[in-house]
Regions:
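Sec/Tat-exported extracytoplasmic proteins
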Residues: 49-50, 57, 61-64, 85, ...
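Acidic/His- and Gly-rich active-site-bordering loop/insert found
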Residues: 2, 22-158
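Fungal secretory targeting signals
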Residues: 1-24
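Structural recognition of the beta-strand scaffold that forms the well-ordered cores
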Residues: 90, 112-116, 159-162, 188-191, ...
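Acidic-glycine-rich active-site phosphate/pyrophosphate-binding loop
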Residues: 106-118, 203-214, 383-390
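Histidine/acidic-residue-rich, glycine-tolerant segments that coordinate divalent metal ions
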Residues: 98-104, 120-128, 132-133, 148-271, ...
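Metal-dependent amide/peptide-bond hydrolase catalytic core
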Residues: 25-30, 34, 233, 237-452
């Protein structure tokens, strides 16, 4: 693929947000920020391989597999990457059978840009979070970046990680704790995500933890001698009611939701066991620590009031809030709008409240990262009737229209990666911003328990 002369194809980048205004990349021809001159080639290359990517996307969507069981998707993606010249693929990395890494080496030492592919589905809902589209965008973005690297003999590396089990099981967190991303010395981490809403370079998410709650009491006949029992169900209901009342004094970004999974089986027996699963979320890690302390007191109150024994365990692999890098987001916005996309201004966009959680957030605390949203539609152009994790979204995620939008997202993140590889001083500026704005991490506890 021929690449035109750099001086004839420099394009002005989207103005950086106010938070990053002093961190624009260094220039060689004027005062405005610049992006790489190769974006048209990125776009053309992705257009040339859509007939290869569509069957991959369709196969993953039509054969949903749960986290850590994505056997078909793992084989499909690794075989596909291995079929492309220059890619070195390693399967089942870090003792995770459905994880993989694919590496494309440039002409020497240089920036290392990475993409994450997700491909797990939801129980009972299939690909209602559109992870088939995420895989497609990341695979396409990685291939396009490598093609520019090959054609221009650029230094550096392109890395595609296959990251299973995003849906509550923390695949990226597990890989990160095992050293996958640090061992490969990545400089940036890129991914995208479909939505039923607007296109945006910024994913704004919550920090979250999950808890398994168990109250143990004492059985007794509910009519003949209820005073001899200790009602575990009452303890759980008291805790739940305390949490409900506490919501009046909480920030709107502090959220908790849960289900009772068991609480007795016979109506004439005082329940000796009650179990529940709860999830708490907050805007960032610091706020989550504060919110957690308040919620734990509610669970302890249930035990204190009834005499039941409380056993509470935090599940491993909690998710951190997403820390978006403004310069990466600015690069994505520039390229996405070049191909017809529309995004809000960064100043307005970042005012959105956080919603949902992702294990990409954990990576964003340790590496400059973005996870742009791209809005998808049904085949007829209408928005899905529901958002992610609904049956309507699963249908839309399988449409050709949604696939076409994923290709646009692939072009956007590939454009970002090529900018990092080719624009003088950009990576240094990205790292300066990252160090200046990185939010305080709390120490992640693999197991957190309360027994009362």
């Amino acid at each position: 693929m021929g690449i035109k002369n750099l001086s004839t194809r420099l394009v002005l980048a989207l103005g950086a947000s106010s938070a990053a205004a002093s961190l624009v990349p260094r220039q060689t021809n004027g005062s405005s920020p610049v992006t790489s001159p190769y974006f048209q080639d990125v776009s053309d290359y992705l257009d040339s391989i859509v007939d290869e990517l569509w069957p991959i996307n369709k196969e993953i969507h039509d054969n949903p597999e749960l986290g850590y069981k994505e056997v078909k998707a793992h084989k499909l993606l690794t075989d596909f990457m291995e079929s492309h010249e220059g890619w070195n693929v390693t399967r089942s990395i870090y003792n995770i059978s459905t994880a993989f890494v694919a590496v494309f080496e440039g002409s020497g030492d240089g920036p290392i840009v990475s993409f994450n592919a997700e491909y797990d589905a939801l129980p009972g809902l299939g690909h209602a979070c559109g992870h088939n589209l995420i895989a497609t965008a990341s695979v396409g973005g990685a291939l396009a970046t490598a093609e520019i690297m090959r054609a221009e003999k650029l230094p550096g590396k392109v890395i595609l990680f296959g990251t299973p089990a995003e849906e509550s099981l923390g695949g990226k967190v597990k890989l990160h704790e095992a050293g996958a991303f640090r061992d490969h010395n990545i400089d940036i981490s890129l991914i995208t995500h479909p939505t039923n809403g607007a296109d945006t370079p910024y994913m704004i998410t919550t920090s979250t933890d999950r808890f398994e709650v168990e109250y143990r009491g004492k059985e007794a006949h509910a009519a003949a001698g209820p005073w001899e029992g200790i009602n575990a169900q009452d303890a759980l209901i008291l805790a739940n009611n305390a949490i409900a009342l506490m919501r009046q004094q909480t920030r709107h970004t502090d959220k908790i939701h849960g289900i009772i999974t068991s609480a007795g089986s016979r109506i004439n027996v005082i329940p000796a066991l009650a179990e529940a699963s709860f999830q708490i979320r907050s805007a960032d890690n610091v706020a989550l620590e504060q919110w957690t302390e308040r919620v734990m007191k509610c669970f302890e109150a249930g035990a204190l009031a009834t005499g039941a024994e409380l056993n509470l365990t935090m599940r491993p692999y909690g998710y951190d809030n997403m820390v978006n890098n403004d310069l990466l987001a600015s690069s994505y916005a520039k390229h996405f709008t070049e191909i017809g996309g529309k995004v809000p201004s960064a100043e307005i966009d970042k005012l959105r409240d956080p919603d949902g959680s992702t294990d990409q957030g954990n990576l964003s605390h340790d590496f400059p990262s973005i996870s742009p949203y791209f809005g998808i539609t049904n085949e007829n152009g209408t928005a899905p009737a529901g958002g992610p994790h609904t049956a309507a979204f699963e249908v839309a995620a399988g449409s050709r229209a949604a696939f076409d939008k994923a290709i646009m997202a692939a072009k956007g993140i590939a454009g970002v990666a090529v900018d990092v590889l080719t624009v003088d001083g950009l990576l240094e500026q990205i790292n300066e911003e990252f160090e200046a704005t990185k939010e305080k991490r709390r120490k992640r506890r693999s197991v957190f328990q309360i027994s009362r």
